């Protein structure tokens, strides 16, 4: 996969983020390094390794699912969103 200006523009649009022009070259280099690293994983022979679902013997310990409301944190996060309304993020429609 080639990391070029077209890919960066697509990622900017999908993420609703904007990358400064002076940072784009560094970002392209970093993304290319990440992709090359991940592509190296395709060369690893795992045919003799048994599949596992957890690294913890006996399964993953569960915790009670409890909700917490922190209005100060919520407001802080929403203040940094490009668009928000009534405590929710407003995002562009992507599915017709």
Curated annotation (Swiss-Prot):
GO terms for molecular function: asparaginyl-tRNA synthase (glutamine-hydrolyzing) activity; ATP binding; glutaminyl-tRNA synthase (glutamine-hydrolyzing) activity. Its EC number is 6.3.5.-. GO terms for biological process: glutaminyl-tRNAGln biosynthesis via transamidation; regulation of translational fidelity; translation. Keywords: ATP-binding, Ligase, Nucleotide-binding, Protein biosynthesis. It holds the Pfam family GatC. It catalyses: L-glutamyl-tRNA(Gln) + L-glutamine + ATP + H2O = L-glutaminyl-tRNA(Gln) + L-glutamate + ADP + phosphate + H(+); L-aspartyl-tRNA(Asn) + L-glutamine + ATP + H2O = L-asparaginyl-tRNA(Asn) + L-glutamate + ADP + phosphate + 2 H(+). InterPro entries: Asp/Glu-ADT_sf_sub_c, GatC. Allows the formation of correctly charged Asn-tRNA(Asn) or Gln-tRNA(Gln) through the transamidation of misacylated Asp-tRNA(Asn) or Glu-tRNA(Gln) in organisms which lack either or both of asparaginyl-tRNA or glutaminyl-tRNA synthetases. The reaction takes place in the presence of glutamine and ATP through an activated phospho-Asp-tRNA(Asn) or phospho-Glu-tRNA(Gln). Heterotrimer of A, B and C subunits. Belongs to the GatC family. This is Aspartyl/glutamyl-tRNA(Asn/Gln) amidotransferase subunit C. It comes from Aliarcobacter butzleri (strain RM4018) (Arcobacter butzleri).
């Amino acid at each position: 996969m080639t990391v070029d200006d077209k890919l960066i523009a697509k990622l900017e649009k999908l993420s609703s983020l904007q990358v400064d022009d002076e940072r784009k070259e560094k970002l392209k280099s970093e993304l290319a390094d990440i992709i090359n690293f991940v592509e190296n994983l395709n060369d690893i022979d795992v045919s003799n390794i048994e599949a596992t679902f957890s690294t913890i013997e006996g399964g993953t310990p569960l915790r009670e699912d409890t909700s917490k409301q922190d209005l100060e944190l919520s407001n802080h996060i929403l203040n940094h969103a490009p668009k928000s309304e009534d405590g929710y993020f407003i995002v562009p429609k992507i599915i017709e």
